Amino acid sequence: MLRRGLMLAALLLPLSGAAAAGEADEAAIRRGEYVFNAAGCYGCHTDVKAKGAPLAGGRRLKTPFGDFLGPNITPDPEHGIGGWSLADFTRALREGISPAGDPYYPAFPYTSFSRMKEEDIADLWAWLQTVEPADRANDPHELAFPYGWRWLTGVWRALYFTPGDFVAGDPPAIVAEEDREKWERGAYLVRVSGHCGECHTPRGVLGRWMRISSWLAIRLAPRVAPFPILRPIARLESVAGVWRTLKVIWKLAWTRTVISPVAPWAR
């Protein structure tokens, strides 16, 4: 009888292990969807105007250097990231290097993603595997001379790109000690996964952040609406400050990017 029980337990162990692994995968996928929405991947990798397939690429980003076309990041093995490994994906986000070893243009905000936690990258990768593959070839960027010379990106990286882990730093005095953890979480979302500063901070001639002007409005190209100022100019206790805060909360919670499909709340 004991022998039968042991045999039955041995047979059931793989099944229980598979169930536990399945639950872990589902949890990773749910977390990955959260990271996906926080990072705003949909906005740059979906051609909403042309009613393109989700994450199939083609979204045009106008800049002073020319137009960048978002690539296909569906699991399609030929045109998307279906042939990538998690290590390839991690290197792309944290180092800005493609699986072929080519540097990405910093229009892809790896300068912020480089500080993303590895567990967040793994979760995002797990969720992307659930996306419907799209057999859509990537469009070449349409850049002004001489920015089409990709080797120049290496010079830019040497000057302005410093990878590393995220360090929140000390919160301002207005943040209560009991809210420190929330502030650090918010700082991570804003500076890293949300990469808000990439669009809301002015840049110099070569695309370097003008950090003294962090969170001020920026216009990427002529005839393109500027991104709004994110600094808390008006105090919260004033009528203007309360109204401004309510507008930000409303946009983050309810809108679906009426102004621009680039913002992270596009979904």
Regions found by a protein language model. Name each.
Residues 30-33, 46, 50-79, 107-111, ...:
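Sequence context of c-type cytochrome heme-c attachment sites
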Residues 32, 38-48, 89, 124, ...:
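The canonical Cys-X-X-Cys-His
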Residues 60-91, 111-121, 213-255, 267:
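Electron-transfer interface patches adjacent to heme c in soluble/periplasmic c-type cytochromes
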Residues 83-88, 98-106, 203-208, 240-245, ...:
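Extended intrinsically disordered, low-complexity coil regions enriched in Ser, Thr, Gly, Ala
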Residues 136-158:
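Extended, well-folded interaction surfaces typified by the phenylalanyl-tRNA synthetase beta subunit core
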